[in-house]
Curated annotation (Swiss-Prot):
This is ATP-dependent Clp protease ATP-binding subunit ClpX. The lineage of its organism: Bacteria, Pseudomonadati, Pseudomonadota, Gammaproteobacteria, Vibrionales. Residues 4-57 form the ClpX-type ZB domain. Disulfide bonds: none annotated. Component of the ClpX-ClpP complex. Forms a hexameric ring that, in the presence of ATP, binds to fourteen ClpP subunits assembled into a disk-like structure with a central cavity, resembling the structure of eukaryotic proteasomes. It comes from Vibrio parahaemolyticus serotype O3:K6 (strain RIMD 2210633). The keyword ATP-binding applies. Zn(2+) binds at residues 16, 19, 38, 41. InterPro entries: AAA+_ATPase (IPR003593), ATP-dep_Clp_protease_ClpX (IPR050052), ATPase_AAA_core (IPR003959), Clp_ATPase_C (IPR019489), Clp_protease_ATP-bd_su_ClpX (IPR004487), ClpX_bact (IPR046425), P-loop_NTPase (IPR027417), Znf_CppX_C4 (IPR010603). ATP-dependent specificity component of the Clp protease. It directs the protease to specific substrates. Can perform chaperone functions in the absence of ClpP.
Length: 426
């Protein structure tokens, strides 16, 4: 290497071999064998290295893992009800990340198993929201997959490996981050096999998908192309260890209550030993779900091996009217708060009367869509107001009552100017 130096009055003038600045232009010039580097270039190199390794550095040991109580408290801020499910999830998630932090084997040589989770509950009961809230709180990558789109390898549809590919996309293809992520597979009940007995014919979207998911959920090293499944076979594959990924599967399991009821029924005997059951003893779907056993899931259509990969099973109950009213108002991101924030951007206050909230909850109950139906009801009720409000002047408040929800009247608009109020009333 040619030394960048020039003769000056008292000797050589030295230059940085990287940026070309002279020794007089920098604070410090460090000499090496035939090369020099200035303090500014050293700082720049440090910045580059820090930027590249900051995402893969392990978390400090001092950074404590949230306790099950802390996880549950955070879930309470965003999810109403489902207390038992929250407790089960908090413990399972805590144990999973404790296993990752301390290794699969304890000091006594005890191997710690992987605890994937199965959520059983009706539509709109909060299964997806629980999984999303957990991932956000723990600051780990999260992705959702729809089990109905999955097929066995070699058939039209999505490979199960595409689930991991989506997770990698969420964290910019950082494998170390992806291996600490959470995957939520929705509609898992839709891949139940079509008959209770093993089928002779191919069931590529039912039992076949369950077989394909087995290894992925239990833990394997999945080879995933960065740009998607079967269409780019020439690309270099990324190796992802799925034993460190937490899988949460959820489904409504419509009809499972009948399977459970059939098993627990005691009034089917004959003769003097038969137990007579009252018609009033009929249990709700939620109550029956709490009595679910692996044998019920097998009868429903999940294969025993698949059920064995989901050792933590918890059920969610149907949301009643009071719970739906709470969901509308209490969570940090409650729907009424979201719409109030939108109206605030137009310098208007949005107020929901108590009877309006109850009417919204009743409508959602009638639709049997749980909390999922609340937004569509609010959207249709507020559509005209949200259309007119940006063009209106002096509207300071919008009041919604029961008659508005039932379509019997328009929202009450309160103007800051008395003249406008009178004109609006006309």
């Amino acid at each position: 290497m040619t030394d960048k130096s020039k003769e000056s009055g008292s000797g050589k003038l030295l230059y940085c071999s990287f940026c070309g600045k002279s020794q007089h232009e920098v604070r410090k010039l460090i000499a090496g064998p035939s090369v020099y580097i200035c303090d500014e270039c050293v700082d720049l190199c440090n910045d580059i290295i820090r930027e590249e390794i900051k995402d893969v550095l392990p978390k400090k040991e001092s950074e404590a893992l949230p306790t099950p109580k802390q996880i549950r408290e955070h879930l309470d801020d965003y999810v109403i009800g489902q207390d038992y499910a929250k407790k089960v999830l908090a413990v399972a998630v805590y144990n999973h990340y404790k296993r990752l932090r301390n290794g699969d084997t304890t000091s006594e040589g005890v191997e710690l198993g992987k605890s994937n989770i199965l959520l059983i509950g009706p539509t709109g009961s909060g299964k997806t929201l629980l999984a999303e809230t957990l991932a956000r709180f723990l600051d780990v990558p999260f992705t959702m997959a729809d089990a109905t789109t999955l097929t066995e390898a070699g058939y039209v549809g999505e490979d199960v490996e595409n689930i991991i590919q989506k997770l990698l996309q969420k964290c910019d293809y950082d494998v170390a981050k992806a291996e600490r992520g959470i995957v939520y597979i929705d509609e898992i009940d839709k891949i139940s096999r079509k008959a209770e007995n093993p089928s002779i014919t191919r069931d590529v979207s039912g039992e076949g998908v369950q077989q394909a998911l087995l290894k992925l959920i239990e833990g394997t090293v999945a080879s995933v192309p960065p740009q998607g499944g079967r269409k780019h076979p020439q690309q270099e594959f990324l190796q992802v260890d799925t034993s460190k990924i937490l899988f949460i599967c959820g489904g409504a399991f419509a009809g499972l209550d009948k399977v459970i009821e059939q098993r627990v029924a005691t009034g089917t005997g004959i003769g003097f030993g038969a137990e007579v059951r009252s018609k009033n003893e009929t249990k709700t779907v939620g109550e029956l779900f709490t009595q679910v056993e692996p044998e019920d899931l097998v009868k429903y259509g999940l294969i025993p091996e698949f059920i064995g990969r989901l050792p933590v099973t918890t059920t969610l109950t149907e949301l009643d009217e009071e719970a739906l009213i709470q969901i509308l108002c209490e969570p940090k991101n409650a729907l009424t708060k979201q719409y109030a924030a939108l109206f605030e951007l137009e310098n208007a206050e949005l107020e929901f009367r108590e009877d309006a909230l109850r009417a919204i909850a009743k409508k959602a109950m009638e639709r049997k869509t749980g909390a999922r139906g609340l937004r569509s009801i609010l959207e249709s009720v507020l559509l005209e107001t949200m259309y007119e409000l940006p063009s209106a002047t002096d509207v300071s408040k919008v009041v919604i009552d029961e008659s508005v929800i039932n379509g019997e009247s328009e929202p009450l608009l309160i103007y800051s100017n008395a003249d406008n109020q009178a004109a609006g009333a006309e």
